[in-house]
């Protein structure tokens, strides 16, 4: 996702109307250049921002991936409580009313789940954290989506590491032995949604969040809230513990098998080396080796 300056630079025109402090403000650009200076207009009770723009056909082709655009608009309706989106791709108007983050999780969950989705939320120092998660029975990978101000942080960041740490800490608190982070992530489906005033990203592509303070906020929220859910929902906790213990056993069995394979390889290498010791004579009759195929 890019900002208004970037969109303006690649648009044939870009107009913005802002409703705030009881007035309407307008500004307009063409080909990235200012053509309508900022103007304070009429009084209004409205709030919000209206953006109109058209991508420059000298930069972009006329072909637009409408399916991708519709998917993004639906994603925005999930991430923003109270938001209504209307769009028309030429075949009639579509209204997307705000849906919950829980609905988003259900939309991306393709396997049978252990229980109902768990939802946690906290606000601290102008930062709001929303987390929704569930576990699937027959899923051995994981799906964790992370967002910051509607930007999909595909490479994760401090909010993701805080989420993982919180999950692990909560499950350790109920006494599961030999547990690792890989064990608790198996079968997990989750969404972490952050709203903050001044996000700090690694690089211009905004794919990785660098905010240690948010890591702690997410970790504390998930650890405390998930621990409470595990304490209150005994059946869910029992089923999840059973699933994780299966993952732990599979990991330990695989580790043991690898160790046994290494020992066998080492023993075989020792025997082969002993039989094929380095030559210490220059006499070919004493140093030659014949390899015969067959019996």
Please give the residue ranges for each predicted region.
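Conserved P-loop NTPase motor core
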Residues: 1-3
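GHKL-family ATPase ATP-binding module
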Residues: 5-9, 13-295
